[in-house]
Amino acid sequence: MEEIRAWRHVFKLDPNKPIDDERLERLCESGTDAVIVGGTDGVTLDGVLDLLARIRRFSVPCALEVTDIEALTPGFDAYLIPMVLNSCRVDWVIGRHHEAVKQYGDVMNWDEIFAEGYCILNGECKAAKLTEANTALDDDDVVAYARLAEHLYKLPIFYLEYSGTYGNPSLVEKVKRALSRTQLVYGGGIMTPEQAAEMARYADTVVVGNAVYDSFESALATVEAVKRIDGENEISGVK
């Protein structure tokens, strides 16, 4: 978990979307802290294995975000398990997790497995529709989910997911202030270095996903943008 805590910038790659070898190499050697493999739909074992094999040519840490048990495979440095706290379906909070442990609990390496308390905030995204997430939340609702994740469920990660749209930095700041031990991850709509830097001022980890496919050069520039924020914080003494 200590290695994951050190992640400030992460690229998320969808095994259901194409990326050529040249771009993958540039991404993996960009200085990002890790690559997460994961997606909402169309995730297959073949797609995951292909992407894993290609990423493993490089030294960057690689994690699998498990959304479909049929696409689960050994070989990743870590396995991230989403628990959608604002889902209206128990399946996405604990049901699927129970089934996975029932099938594979005897062979699981729990040192490599980390639960993510997800709060999905873009009601129009695929993830919200699939999980039937209640996205009609005010700031107090979201902060309450963050506190539940840290204090009641003792989750190591709280993931604010805007999935395809850029979120509210002031809300991210409020959530960060409510957390002391749980790692705050922000994902959604980061298309420019400026947006990455803005969210990196508050979130422990920023995730860049769609920009890899829609605006590749801009996506690469987000790595340096986050590093600049860390440099500014180091100079000013901010942690």
Swiss-Prot record:
The enzyme's E.C. designation: 2.5.1.n9
Q: Which Gene3D superfamilies match?
A: FMN-linked oxidoreductases
Name the pathway.
Membrane lipid metabolism; glycerophospholipid metabolism
Show the GO MF annotations. heptaprenylglyceryl phosphate synthase activity; magnesium ion binding
Where, by residue number, does sn-glycerol 1-phosphate bind? K12, Y159, L160, E161, Y162, S163, G164, G189, G209, N210
Q: For Mg(2+), which residues are the binding ones? A: D14, T40
Q: Which InterPro entries match?
A: GGGP/HepGP_synthase_I, GGGP/HepGP_synthase_sf, GGGP_HepGP_synthase
Q: Report which reactions are catalysed by this protein.
A: sn-glycerol 1-phosphate + all-trans-heptaprenyl diphosphate = 3-heptaprenyl-sn-glycero-1-phosphate + diphosphate
Q: Name one GO biological process term.
A: glycerophospholipid biosynthetic process
Superkingdom in the source lineage: Bacteria
Question: What are the UniProt keywords, alphabetically?
Answer: Lipid biosynthesis, Lipid metabolism, Magnesium, Metal-binding, Phospholipid biosynthesis, Phospholipid metabolism, Transferase
Q: Which cofactor does it need?
A: Mg(2+)
Q: Which family does it belong to?
A: Belongs to the GGGP/HepGP synthase family. Group I subfamily.
Q: What does this protein do?
A: Prenyltransferase that catalyzes in vivo the transfer of the heptaprenyl moiety of heptaprenyl pyrophosphate (HepPP; 35 carbon atoms) to the C3 hydroxyl of sn-glycerol-1-phosphate (G1P), producing heptaprenylglyceryl phosphate (HepGP). This reaction is an ether-bond-formation step in the biosynthesis of archaea-type G1P-based membrane lipids found in Bacillales.
- Complexes and interactors: Homodimer.
This protein is called Heptaprenylglyceryl phosphate synthase
Tell me the organism. Answer: Geobacillus thermodenitrificans (strain NG80-2)
